[in-house]
């Protein structure tokens, strides 16, 4: 009998056979996708207790599934959540539909708005993936190919098949995916700064906030830069990351002495105040272009995502003040 305030996620034992498209992923990630709404802690608990079995045997959470594996999933109940936060975000979910630039049976290409996390978590219960699952309830597989910071807008790839995810991850690994961003930075960017190579080290503050800094102990990182437009006290630059480190463009521009407008971690308060007065209230970093090979047919694809209304308006005001 179900306890009050409990929700049944899986009402009976299920025996599922792993397809070729599902193979290669960890059992814990597979279960998270199958048992939507179940916290990771419960997933690990039912795996550790042996309630989840593969080919009738116990497994560890890091076990990688193979084609033909038979997975036993037990009945699962979780505490009911207050759905109010989701209902508040219904307008955002609906708005995301209009931001889809391309969709086929392999992938979705989205122009992500600023202010939406790619994944719920860290105190957020709403993200791009959750929204797309609400928009595409029939989709069996939806996973991020790469990430964008919450306050960064622009092109985001979402795979609709595991085979597409593997293919695109390989393209990212061998650096054949070309990604370009637009950033509005403080001051006059110096023409000779075309490439920044500075190793980046991730730190976590006592508050739990994640911050990245340039350090010889960090991981190698490289960003290429070119000037798009100059203004009196700012420059619009194109940034093309060669590596994909956390906060890479934001830290590299700060390292060059030209932090990005409205960057709450790495920015400049005086510059931000000037941009606020012009009407900017978001990080001015936008993933505007991507080029890659289609994971199914190998065709070279290129997509562009336009700046939002606020960004366009700020640039126009800066032009008029020159």
From Swiss-Prot:
SUPFAM superfamilies: Alpha-L RNA-binding motif, Pseudouridine synthase. This is Ribosomal large subunit pseudouridine synthase C. The active site is at residue 149. Keywords: Isomerase, RNA-binding, rRNA processing. CDD domains: PseudoU_synth_RluA_like, S4. Pfam families: PseudoU_synth_2, S4. It comes from Haemophilus influenzae (strain ATCC 51907 / DSM 11121 / KW20 / Rd). One of its GO terms (molecular function) is pseudouridine synthase activity. The keyword Isomerase applies. Its EC number is 5.4.99.24. GO terms for biological process: enzyme-directed rRNA pseudouridine synthesis. Responsible for synthesis of pseudouridine from uracil at positions 955, 2504 and 2580 in 23S ribosomal RNA. It catalyses: uridine(955/2504/2580) in 23S rRNA = pseudouridine(955/2504/2580) in 23S rRNA. It is an enzyme of class 5 (isomerase). Residues 25-82 form the S4 RNA-binding domain. InterPro entries: PsdUridine_synth_cat_dom_sf (IPR020103), PsdUridine_synth_RluA-like_CS (IPR006224), PsdUridine_synth_RluC/D (IPR006225), PsdUridine_synth_RsuA/RluA (IPR006145), RluA_PseudoU_synthase (IPR050188), S4_RNA-bd (IPR002942), S4_RNA-bd_sf (IPR036986). NCBIfam families: PRK11025.1, rluA_subfam. It comes from the Bacteria. Belongs to the pseudouridine synthase RluA family. The keyword Thylakoid does not apply.
